[in-house]
C-alpha cells in the first residue's frame, strides 16, 4: 500500500513543476516588454511636451504604481498561503485513503460466510464490491472538489502576474518620462505637428502591445486547463488502480477466511459499519488512532448484546399460575348462589301482611304470573318453583345496591317489556286498582313501580275482611234494603270455584269488549233514567215509613237512635256485598263455560256496576235530607223525633223488613204500569230469547228490541228490572254449568285416586 501512495504523490509534484513554468514564461515576456519600453523611450526623447500637465500625470502614475506594488506583494503572500493549504489538504486526503484502505482490510477480515442463514460467499463478495464502489464514488467527488480548488488557485496566480506586468509597464513609462524631462530643452525648437504625429504613433503602439498581452493571457489559460485535465486523468488512473488492487486483496482475504465463523463476529462487523458511517458523517478528518477506539466500543456493544441474548428464567418458573386459582372462583360462585333467594328487608310492609295480596298469591294456581313477577322483584333472579310464593310474600320493597338510578331503570325496562295484559295481572295480584279501559301502559308501570318500591295497604282493612270485599260492599251500599234469595254461604262456595273459572273469564273478556263498546253509550243514558226512578221510589218509601212510624212505635232519645242504625247499616252492606260478589263470580263462571253467555254476563255486570254507583249518592242525599228534617222538626214539634226513632227501629229488628220492602218494589212497578206485562211474563220471555240468541254477537239492546216486538210496547223505562232478570237467569245457567264441571272433576279425581286436589279446591 505504501508504493501506491508514492505513485499518487508523483502527479502532484508534476503539478507543482507545471505551475512554475508559466511564471518563467512571464519573466521572459517581461524582459521583452522592457526592451520595447526602451525603444519607446528613445522615440519619446525626440518629442517635446507641450504643457506641464505631463509632470502631474507622471506623479500620479508614480503613486499608483507604489500602491499597486504593495497590493501585489500582499496578494503574492496570500497565494503562497493558499498553495500551502492545498498541499496540506492533498496530504490529508492521502492519509484518509490509507485509513479507509486499512478499514476495508479489517472489514474483509471480519466478514465470513453465513452458513446458517443460507447466504453464500459470492453474495458477501458482491455486497462488499458494491460498498467499495460507493466509497470510490465518494472519493472521486472529493478529488473533483480539490481539483476545482486547484484551478481557482491557478486563475488567481494568473491574475497576479497580469498585475505585475502592468506594474512593469508603469515603471517603463516612468523611465521614459524622466528622459523626456532631461531633453526638453533640445526638443523645444521642434514643430508641434511632429509631436502630434508621434503621439498618434505611440497610441497605436500601445494598442498593439495590449492586444499582444491579451493573446498571451488566453494562451496561458488554455495551457493551464490542459495541465489540470492531464493531472486529473493521472489521478483517476491511480485511483482506479488502487481500487482494483484493494478489491483483489479483499477477495483473496475473504476466500482465505474460515467457514466456521460465529454470529458474534457478524454482529461486530455490522456495528463497525454503523460506527464508520456515523464517523464519516460527523467529521471528514479522521486519524489512524480512531479505528482502535471504535473497536473498543464495538467490543463493549457486543458484550452487552451477548448479555441480553443470554437465556432468561424459563416460563414455568414464573409465578403466573398462582394468580389463577380455580378453587377461589368456585367458592365465590357458591356464595352467590346461596345468596340468591335471601329476601332483604325493604322500606314497605311485607306482602304477606297485606291480606288481599296474601290471599291472591296463595290462591293463584297458575304460576306464570308469579314466575314473571319474581325476577322483577328480586333483580332478575329466578327462584325455585316451591319457593316462588314464599319469596314474593316475603318481599317488602326494593333494596338498591350501587347506583339507584341504573337499578330503577332496569326494573322499569323489565316492566316495559311486559304486555299490558300481564301488567294488569300484576296489578290484580298486588291489589292495585286500575281501570283497564282508560289507563295507559305508562301509568300502570308507574303505579306498579311506586307500589313495589314501598308496598302498603291500598285500602282500609277492618277485621278479617279484605280490601276487595270492602270495595264491593261500597258498590252494593245502594241495596241495603233489597235482600236477595241467595245466602252468604253461596258466596263462600262461589269464591272457591272462582279460581277455576279465572282463566276462562280472562279469555271471555276479549269477546265481551266488542259488545261493551256498543252498550257504553246506552248505559250512560240508562244510568240517568235509573237515578231519576230510584229517587222517586226513595221519596215514596220515606213517606210510607213516616206514616207507619206515626201509627205506633214508642219514642226514644235522639242520641241513642243514630248509633245502632249505623252499625246495622254496615252489617247489611256486608251481606249485600257478599251476595253481589257471588252473582258476579257466577256470571264469570258462566262466561268460562260458554263464550256466548260470558258476553251477556259481562254486559249485565257493567250495568249493575253502573247502577251501584249512583245509589251511593242517593243514600248520602237521603241521610243528609233526613238529618236536615230532624234538625228542623226538633225545634217545632216532638212528633218529628218520634218519627225518626220509628224509622230507625225496624232496621234494628232484623233484615226482614228490608226484604219486604224489596218485595213491594215490583208490586209498585206493576201498579204504575197496569197494562204492562208482569215480571213473570218477562222472565219467561227472556229465558226463551236467551235460548235463541247467539251470545258472541247479541247485546242488551238486541234483547230489549226482541221483547218490545213480543209485547208491542216500549220497555225502556223497565230496563233496570229487565237487566236484573237477565242476570238472575245467567247466574242460574252458570250454576248449572259449574255443577256439571264439579261432577266431571270429582270423577277424574276418583279415577286418579288423589285426595290432595280436593284440599286445594277448598283452600
From Swiss-Prot:
**Composition-biased stretches (Basic and acidic residues):** 32-44, 72-97, 124-172, 180-242, 253-264, 295-311, 534-547, 661-681
Would I find Glycoprotein among this entry's keywords? no
Question: What are the entry keywords?
Answer: Chromatin regulator, Coiled coil, DNA-binding, Nucleus, Stress response, Transcription, Transcription regulation
Q: Where in the cell is it found?
A: Nucleus; Nucleus, Nucleolus
DNA-binding region positions on the chain: 694-708, 723-727
SUPFAM superfamilies noted in UniProt: DEK C-terminal domain
Q: Where is the composition biased (Gly residues)?
A: 753-763
The induction annotation reads:
Strongly and rapidly down-regulated by salt stress in shoots and roots.
What's a GO cellular component annotated to this UniProt protein?
nucleolus
Query: Where does this protein have compositionally biased stretches of type Polar residues?
Result: 11-20
Hey, what's the signal peptide range on this chain? none
Q: Where is the composition biased (Low complexity)?
A: 485-496, 606-615, 650-660
Q: Does the keyword Coiled coil apply?
A: yes
* Domain DEK-C, residue spans: 676-731
Where the record places motif Nuclear localization signal 1 is 284-291
Q: Where is this motif: Nuclear localization signal 2?
A: 483-490
Quote the tissue specificity entry: Highly expressed in young seedlings.
Please explain the role this protein plays, according to its UniProt record.
Answer: Chromatin-associated protein which contributes to the modulation of chromatin structure (such as super-helical structure of DNA) and function. Binds to chromatin of protein-coding genes throughout the genome to regulate nucleosome occupancy and chromatin accessibility, and to modulate the expression of target genes. Negative regulator of stress tolerance (e.g. high salt).
Instruction: Return the protein name.
Output: DEK domain-containing chromatin-associated protein 3
Name the source organism: Arabidopsis thaliana (Mouse-ear cress)
Q: What lineage does the source organism belong to? A: Eukaryota, Viridiplantae, Streptophyta, Embryophyta, Tracheophyta
Amino acid at each position: 500500500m505504501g508504493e501506491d501512495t508514492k505513485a499518487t504523490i508523483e502527479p502532484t509534484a508534476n503539478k507543482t513543476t507545471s505551475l512554475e513554468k508559466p511564471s518563467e514564461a512571464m519573466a521572459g515576456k517581461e524582459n521583452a516588454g522592457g526592451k520595447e519600453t526602451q525603444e519607446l523611450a528613445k522615440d519619446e526623447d525626440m518629442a517635446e511636451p507641450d504643457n506641464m500637465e505631463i509632470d502631474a500625470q507622471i506623479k500620479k502614475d508614480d503613486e499608483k504604481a507604489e500602491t499597486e506594488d504593495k497590493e501585489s506583494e500582499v496578494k503574492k503572500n496570500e497565494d503562497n498561503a493558499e498553495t500551502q493549504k492545498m498541499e496540506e489538504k492533498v496530504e490529508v486526503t492521502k492519509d484518509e485513503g490509507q485509513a479507509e484502505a486499512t478499514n476495508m482490510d479489517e472489514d474483509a477480515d471480519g466478514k465470513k460466510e453465513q452458513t446458517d442463514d443460507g447466504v453464500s460467499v459470492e453474495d458477501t463478495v458482491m455486497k462488499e464490491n458494491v460498498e467499495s464502489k460507493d466509497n470510490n464514488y465518494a472519493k472521486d467527488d472529493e478529488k473533483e472538489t480539490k481539483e476545482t480548488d486547484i484551478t481557482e488557485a491557478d486563475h488567481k496566480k494568473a491574475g497576479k502576474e497580469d498585475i505585475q506586468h502592468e506594474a512593469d509597464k508603469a515603471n517603463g513609462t516612468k523611465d521614459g518620462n524622466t528622459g523626456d524631462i532631461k531633453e526638453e530643452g533640445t526638443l523645444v525648437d521642434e514643430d508641434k505637428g511632429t509631436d502630434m504625429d508621434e503621439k498618434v504613433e505611440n497610441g497605436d503602439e500601445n494598442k498593439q502591445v495590449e492586444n499582444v498581452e491579451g493573446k498571451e493571457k488566453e494562451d496561458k489559460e488554455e495551457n493551464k486547463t490542459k495541465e489540470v485535465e492531464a493531472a486529473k486523468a493521472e489521478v483517476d488512473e491511480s485511483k482506479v488502480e488502487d481500487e482494483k488492487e484493494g478489491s483483489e486483496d479483499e477477495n483473496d482475504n475473504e476466500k482465505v477466511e474460515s467457514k466456521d465463523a460465529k454470529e458474534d463476529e457478524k454482529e461486530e462487523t455490522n456495528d463497525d459499519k454503523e460506527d464508520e458511517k456515523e464517523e464519516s458523517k460527523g467529521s471528514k478528518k479522521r486519524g489512524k488512532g480512531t479505528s482502535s477506539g471504535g473497536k473498543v466500543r464495538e467490543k463493549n456493544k457486543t458484550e452487552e448484546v451477548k448479555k441480553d441474548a443470554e437465556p432468561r428464567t424459563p416460563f414455568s418458573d414464573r409465578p403466573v399460575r398462582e394468580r389463577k386459582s380455580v378453587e377461589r372462583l368456585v367458592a365465590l360462585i357458591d356464595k352467590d348462589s346461596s345468596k340468591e333467594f335471601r329476601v332483604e328487608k325493604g322500606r314497605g310492609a311485607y306482602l304477606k301482611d297485606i291480606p288481599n295480596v296474601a290471599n291472591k298469591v296463595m290462591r293463584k294456581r297458575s304460576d306464570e304470573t308469579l314466575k314473571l313477577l319474581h325476577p322483577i322483584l328480586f333483580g332478575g333472579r329466578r327462584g325455585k318453583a316451591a319457593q316462588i310464593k314464599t319469596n314474593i310474600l316475603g318481599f317488602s320493597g326494593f333494596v338498591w345496591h350501587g347506583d339507584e338510578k341504573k337499578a330503577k331503570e332496569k326494573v322499569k325496562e323489565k316492566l316495559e317489556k311486559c304486555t299490558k295484559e300481564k301488567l294488569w295481572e300484576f296489578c290484580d295480584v298486588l291489589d292495585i286498582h286500575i281501570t283497564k279501559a282508560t289507563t295507559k301502559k305508562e301509568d300502570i308501570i308507574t303505579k306498579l313501580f311506586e307500589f313495589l318500591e314501598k308496598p302498603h295497604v291500598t285500602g282500609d282493612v277492618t277485621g278479617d275482611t279484605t280490601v276487595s270485599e270492602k270495595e264491593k260492599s261500597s258498590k252494593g251500599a245502594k241495596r241495603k234494603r233489597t235482600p236477595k234469595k241467595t245466602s252468604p254461604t253461596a258466596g263462600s262456595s262461589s269464591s272457591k270455584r272462582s279460581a277455576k273459572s279465572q282463566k276462562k273469564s280472562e279469555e271471555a273478556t276479549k269477546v265481551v269488549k266488542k259488545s261493551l263498546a256498543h252498550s257504553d253509550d246506552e248505559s250512560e243514558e240508562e244510568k240517568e233514567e235509573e237515578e231519576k226512578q230510584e229517587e222517586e221510589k226513595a221519596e215514596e218509601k220515606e213517606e210510607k215509613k213516616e206514616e207507619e212510624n206515626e201509627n205506633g212505635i214508642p219514642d226514644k232519645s235522639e242520641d241513642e237512635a243514630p248509633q245502632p242504625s249505623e252499625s246495622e247499616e254496615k252489617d247489611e252492606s256486608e251481606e249485600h256485598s257478599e251476595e253481589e260478589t257471588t252473582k258476579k263470580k257466577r256470571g264469570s263462571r258462566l262466561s268460562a263455560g260458554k263464550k256466548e253467555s260470558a258476553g251477556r254476563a259481562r254486559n249485565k255486570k257493567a250495568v249493575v256496576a253502573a247502577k251501584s254507583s249512583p245509589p251511593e249518592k242517593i243514600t248520602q242525599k237521603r241521610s243528609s235530607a233526613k238529618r236536615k228534617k230532624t234538625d228542623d222538626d226538633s225545634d217545632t214539634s216532638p212528633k218529628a223525633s218520634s218519627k225518626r226513632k220509628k224509622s230507625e227501629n225496624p232496621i234494628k229488628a232484623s233484615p226482614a223488613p228490608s226484604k219486604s220492602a224489596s218485595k213491594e218494589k215490583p208490586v209498585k212497578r206493576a201498579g204504575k204500569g197496569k197494562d204492562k206485562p208482569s215480571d213473570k211474563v218477562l222472565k219467561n220471555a227472556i229465558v226463551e230469547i236467551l235460548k235463541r240468541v247467539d251470545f258472541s254477537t247479541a247485546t242488551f239492546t238486541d234483547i230489549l228490541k226482541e221483547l218490545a216486538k213480543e209485547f208491542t210496547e216500549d220497555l225502556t223505562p223497565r230496563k233496570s228490572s229487565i237487566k236484573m232478570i237477565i242476570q238472575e237467569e245467567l247466574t242460574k245457567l252458570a250454576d248449572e254449568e259449574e255443577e256439571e264441571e264439579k261432577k266431571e272433576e270429582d270423577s277424574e279425581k276418583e279415577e286418579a285416586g288423589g285426595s290432595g286436589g280436593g284440599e286445594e279446591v277448598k283452600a
